[in-house]
């Protein structure tokens, strides 16, 4: 996933340690139980917080966020982190931001300043930005947006997209394997 390279760097540094709480789509059968990929990469998962959303009405989302705050707070009190790293803009990430803010644990927000037009995600992402002490954005435009939200420029760092490192460090699949996996045969010209 997007955080795997960062987690590898932290794991290699003897002065640092990290605790990993996995929730959301990582635990979803529909999304392929991707927490198993985390385990396959030899990362210890300190806790799994299973949160099921039962509908998409405002009251369902409020229940989900409330449950997430309650469960994440319980784990944070137990783990006592010095810093919380958050990537994303989903309900559970927003909930983790609320918990960290209330427990006065600094938040390091990754990929802030981005825009998802026509989606509520922007509101959650920008709220997480406002709760955060450190900001690691993917480009200068997003740095400008985080700055416009009133954040200290000294705490905003342009580091590029985490997906780029993931792609650069991925093993490429052969053309033949793609054809086999997708049950197709590439022609001279192909349209994706």
Regions found by a protein language model. Give the residues of each.
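Short coil/turn segments at beta-strand junctions that form active-site/ligand-binding loops
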Residues: 16, 82, 188-190
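Structural beta-sheet core signal
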Residues: 19-22, 86, 109, 158
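PLP-dependent amino-acid enzyme catalytic core
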Residues: 13, 47, 59-79, 158, ...
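A generic N-terminal leader/anchor concept
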Residues: 11-17
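Active-site and donor-binding regions of nucleotide-sugar-utilizing enzymes
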Residues: 1-11, 48-153
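Conserved nucleotide-sugar phosphate-binding/catalytic loop shared by glycosyltransferases and other
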Residues: 17-64
């Amino acid at each position: 996933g997007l955080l795997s390279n960062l987690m590898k760097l932290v794991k290699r540094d003897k002065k640092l340690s990290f605790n990993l709480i996995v929730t959301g789509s990582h635990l979803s059968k529909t999304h392929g139980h991707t927490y198993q990929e985390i385990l396959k990469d030899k990362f210890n998962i300190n806790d799994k917080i299973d949160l099921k959303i039962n509908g998409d009405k405002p009251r369902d989302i409020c229940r989900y966020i409330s449950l997430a705050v309650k469960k994440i707070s319980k784990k944070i009190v137990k783990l006592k982190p010095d810093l919380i790293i958050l990537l994303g803009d989903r309900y559970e990430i927003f909930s983790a931001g609320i918990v960290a803010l209330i427990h006065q644990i600094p938040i390091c927000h990754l990929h802030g300043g981005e825009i998802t037009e026509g989606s509520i995600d922007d509101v959650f992402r920008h709220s997480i930005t406002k709760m955060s002490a450190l900001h690691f954005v993917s480009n200068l435009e997003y740095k400008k947006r985080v700055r416009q939200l009133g954040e200290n420029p000294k705490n905003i760092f342009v580091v590029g997209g985490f997906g780029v490192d993931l792609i650069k460090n991925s093993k490429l699949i052969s053309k033949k394997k793609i054809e086999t996996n997708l049950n197709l045969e590439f022609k001279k010209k192909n349209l994706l």
